[in-house]
């Protein structure tokens, strides 16, 4: 014979179910989905490529300012100002780091292996920057690990910081000063 649960017992069981965390909350993954990671990587790569291109001497350089948004990702005013300073400095440092220092003739940068993690309103993207700069009959290739920090507000994502992770790395497309 089955005894019916008293009303109070049933209420306690239902309340316990409501208070217990759901299994979805327990499996909350901090990794950012691949589409957003790609979006962040494109935005970060655009800034690095612009700095790399500043190393190559051009007679009629495109003098547009740093973008305020790339691929739907806003660039914070502080990061944009830092990028402008970096580009101006790099335009004057366009010699290969070899004896005789011929001028750079080409530069290409790409970010590979990007992995983004969300923590609260912050997304951190870590990736390897691969830069190739050409001069005369030679080239210099560098691989440097970088971290980019983004803040989110609703659906809007803003790039708020960037730094090199390897303490001894001296990327060719980075300004000399510590203001970044």
Segments (PLM) and residue ranges:
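Core segments of small alpha/beta cavity-forming domains
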Residues: 26-100
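Polar/charged side chains located within well-ordered beta-strands of beta-rich proteins
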Residues: 51, 83, 109, 129-131, ...
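Hydrophobic beta-strand residues in large extracellular and virion-surface proteins
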Residues: 44, 109-111, 116, 125, ...
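N-terminal low-complexity, Pro/Thr-rich disordered segments
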Residues: 18-38, 42, 165-180
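Hydrophobic alpha-helical membrane segments, chiefly transmembrane helices and signal peptide h-regions
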Residues: 11-20, 39-48, 123-127, 157-159
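Low-complexity, intrinsically disordered terminal/linker segments enriched in charged
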Residues: 137-147, 152-180
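Amphipathic, hydrophobic N-terminal targeting peptides for secretion and organelle import
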Residues: 1-29
């Amino acid at each position: 014979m089955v005894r019916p649960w008293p009303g109070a017992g049933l209420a306690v069981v239902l309340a316990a179910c409501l208070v217990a965390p759901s299994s979805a909350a327990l499996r909350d993954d901090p990794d950012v989905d691949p589409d957003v990671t790609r979006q962040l990587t494109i935005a970060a790569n655009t800034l690095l490529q612009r700095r790399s291109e500043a190393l190559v001497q051009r007679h009629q350089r495109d003098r547009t300012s740093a973008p305020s948004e790339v691929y739907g990702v806003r660039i914070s005013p502080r990061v944009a100002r830092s990028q402008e300073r970096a580009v101006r400095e790099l335009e004057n440092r366009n010699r290969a780091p070899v004896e005789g220092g011929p001028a750079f003739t080409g530069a290409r940068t790409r970010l590979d292996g990007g992995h983004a993690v969300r923590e609260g309103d912050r997304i951190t993207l870590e990736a390897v920057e691969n830069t190739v700069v050409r001069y005369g009959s030679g080239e210099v290739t560098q691989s440097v690990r970088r971290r980019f920090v983004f803040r989110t507000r609703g659906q809007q994502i803003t790039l708020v910081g960037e730094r090199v992770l390897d303490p001894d790395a001296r990327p060719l497309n980075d300004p000399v000063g510590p203001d970044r």
